[in-house]
From Swiss-Prot:
Its EC number is 4.1.1.65. PANTHER family: ARCHAETIDYLSERINE DECARBOXYLASE PROENZYME-RELATED. Pathway: Phospholipid metabolism; phosphatidylethanolamine biosynthesis; phosphatidylethanolamine from CDP-diacylglycerol: step 2/2. The record marks 189-190 as: Cleavage (non-hydrolytic). The gene is psd. This is Phosphatidylserine decarboxylase proenzyme. One of its GO terms (cellular component) is plasma membrane. Binds 1 pyruvoyl group covalently per subunit.
Amino acid sequence: MSLFNTVRKTIVPVHKEGYPFVAAFFVASLILGWIFKPLFWIGMIFTLWCAYFFRDPERVTPQDDDLVISPADGKVSAIQMVTPPAELDLGSEPMLRISVFMNVFNCHVNRAPMRGRIVSINYRSGSFVNAELDKASEDNERNGLVIETRHGQIGVVQIAGLVARRILCWANPNEPVDAGERFGLIRFGSRLDVFLPAGAAPRVSLGQVAIAGETVIAEFASTKGPIISRRS
């Protein structure tokens, strides 16, 4: 194995959405270093920190249509039955909601929790209160996806927070999506809510750390065989 391949496999890649920020910090480091040499190294610390914020590591996703995979890195902050947001058009019956809160140190890339077809994408403007608060689901700026799966329609909602005020989503309606596939990003943390229909049982507990594209957060009843995985 060449040195280049070794380095490439060791260094976690940076998502392209982070390139402008990393470049800006690097240029600022050069300017500061020209003014006063030690400032260059201080600037480089912030440059590396920014690259870390926008890291986009590969994940090994279980390939089982009965499993619901975490859409975000972070801490499970809520597991409850609630009425889904009206803009998702998922009805008025309570659904299982599992929330994952991302802090500024978590990976910001969001991934699809199940395989299916994207039915709709709905953006709603709002406020920017602390995303850990329950009212953030109703009050904060958010972007919701509805995905048609073998178990019915599910909702995935990106929620802005106190620090994170930029939601990105590059998915499109009527597109197929795989479990663990990247579909969006929230700059500098926040929260993801997953809304699941009847038949889904949680497989995580409050406060548990979840990994996007890998951690099973819920499961639908099944009698199928062994689970395989796919890198994404």
